[in-house]
């Protein structure tokens, strides 16, 4: 019995060793197949299995890469600036909806605005509070806006900005107050249509201060060359930061109006230029005008930060850099702003064109802004035209087709700019985010913002 038991053990051991040897050989074949060396100089079942395993591994790797990319985009999206503009047109919609305007129904209306933005993945709302030298809040310096009360100078009976700040923060959304610096009117030069307490009207009434407000192209503007104007604009921004818990101050693209080759050296603030040190030092009127805007922008940032360093200050200029830096319009020294910490915290160019635009393709314009912001001293956001989605608009047939039919156009713009590592986006405008015309494009946009 003892001898028989020993034989069984030996037999079992022999089987185990044999199995280990076969397994070792199989692994050698598999390893050789993976290395591209076929010891049998032919295709074996093990080599085929190894090839299939390698293919599966590659597929898994690709899937992992795709998942990682999606996760990276999602992570990037979570930290992005994702804003939408709420303009004076949107106050018109509020007034049209409610014949009797009250604090309660304004709160209800704006709560709907914020919830719509949140549902799309937005985390910030930019509310217009000074569209035309007026105020959609209680101001010491500017009259009540007609866009909230129906008539300039008329008190609506509640403080819209106070309500908007409360509603935004209650819904975990940040809010910026948006001002237009120089614009007083559009399409009218009749001072009598302005409220009696409008500073533009009061300045115009006195000969000594009349040039603080200029008439040009059928509209009225505050004169960028006047120190009193810069002080007024700065005080208006400072009071917002002092009195309201806003997260940012936002300015848009209304700086100098556009001139022609014929009138550029004669019109608007040319008189102030001729009396300036710039003229005496033989510096051009173009340099002079850029300096006036630069002085205001720097002064405004300093004022904002003096009240609350945590409040951001940014500007959304027109999207075409050539227009901004031309001799005939805007006089926005955008390269200086982008590469210095003295002027703004962010720039958000309005890149309102499609990929098919003949001369200002979205990708090309975006790339140019990225290159201009190479120092990374200022955050770069991209403004996107939701208002064009679903509409037959554009400079050529291809672009019109793109905006009208490509429901992924907004999504593609975000994806393109995101791959280029811009810091965020702003979408114009609230009304278009909820319109039927742009609904399909907005639904696609939502997939890359949520």
Model-predicted regions and their roles:
Residues 76-107, 176-177, 182-243, 400:
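Active-site-adjacent "subsite" loops/lids of carbohydrate-active enzymes
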Residues 200-320, 325-340, 352-353:
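Polysaccharide-binding and catalytic clefts of secreted carbohydrate-active enzymes
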Residues 108-135, 243-248, 340-347, 420-424:
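Catalytic domains of carbohydrate-active enzymes, especially glycoside hydrolases
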Residues 120-156:
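Aromatic-lined carbohydrate-binding/catalytic grooves of carbohydrate-active enzymes
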Residues 22-39:
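Sec-dependent signal peptide cleavage junction
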Residues 335, 339-360, 369-372, 376-450:
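Substrate-binding cleft of secreted/luminal carbohydrate-active enzymes
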